[in-house]
Amino acid sequence: MKKLVYTLFFVLISVVANGQAKYVFYFIGDGMGVNQVNGTEMFQAELQNGRIGVEPLLFTQFPVATMATTFSATNSVTDSAAAGTALATGKKTYNHAISVNEEKNAIQTVAEKAKKAGKKVGVTTSVSVDHATPAAFYAHQPDRNMYYEIALDLPKANFDFYAGGGFLKPTTTFDNKKAPSIFPIFEEAGYTVARGYNDYKAKSQNAEKMILIQEEGANPSCLPYAIDRKDNDLTLAQITESAIDFLTKGKNKGFFLMVEGGKIDWACHANDAATVFNEVKDMDNAIKVAYEFYKKHPKETLIVVTADHETGGIVLGTGKYALNLKALQHQKHSADGLSKPVSYTHLRAHETCADL
């Protein structure tokens, strides 16, 4: 099973470096195991058609599929840093490592190889740009929590397009010391920072390199869950669309684009099934954007969809040989989205949570 992971990586290296595919999409569903996918398809079938069965996602209809184990070099249960490193480099490492080996030496990533081969490169996510999975493609640090240091690696990689919720520690080092803001550093390195989809459209034409994050004041750690989304919120599909737009403008030698559905994992940590299924569907919507591009360039495009690991041990079944997935249609917010505005200490004496 270890060979399957390496095979995936070496296939990517081959198509990027040897010109077998001009355009490469690498979608990663963080925490997305088999049951997260199956559950989403069953959930869709019951909600859309009122029947037991599956309503297929686009990516489950792709012609080639396989399975792989996910243990790291040091742990039976990996984390996103070690798993992201494996997906980015083809090498196993210790938990918390960002594209360094067990001796803490940097390992070259497939994105870096693509850049050296003359491709444009994009690294995107629905969580923060300095989070473990996206970081594994452009940074080399001994600990995933070194957010400031990871952000400093971003301009060193010199990739063309980055996108996500924002940056977690833009002015604070790993040892909690005050540091210069990363944003002027990005700008000095030639990056244009766009805040929101409309700002991207206004700035992209004149930008040489782009960092797309959420609007000022939004939570920098992530995009909102799909189930909580408001009209003006940035989406993973918009990020994918923007990345394609940016990476194909000007001299077009092809691109390598990594897109992470990072909050599948977060919803699984919360044991929030309705939010999980909505997040898987949301990543599928981003894959549809790539698929529309593929239909215009079918002989030049490769789309790979994978996961770094499964989260939560989700089980589809009960002791009564039944699932009540339709009950989840009544959930209108994530557990996280509901808990933030609800504070039991602020309820008036005559109120209950049902009143809010």
What are these regions (language model features)?
Residues 22-23, 32-38, 42-85, 131-348, ...:
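A post-motif C-terminal structural segment
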Residues 2-7:
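Sec-dependent signal peptide recognition
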Residues 28-29:
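Hydrophobic residues in beta-strands of the RecA-like P-loop NTPase core, especially within AAA+ ATPase
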Residues 8, 128, 166:
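Residues that line or immediately flank small-molecule/substrate-binding pockets and catalytic motifs
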Residues 95-151:
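Extracytoplasmic mature domains of secreted/periplasmic and thylakoid-lumen proteins
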Residues 10, 34, 89-93:
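Short helix-loop boundary/capping segments at the starts of domains
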Residues 75, 79-102:
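A glycine- and small-residue-enriched flexible loop/hinge segment at structural boundaries
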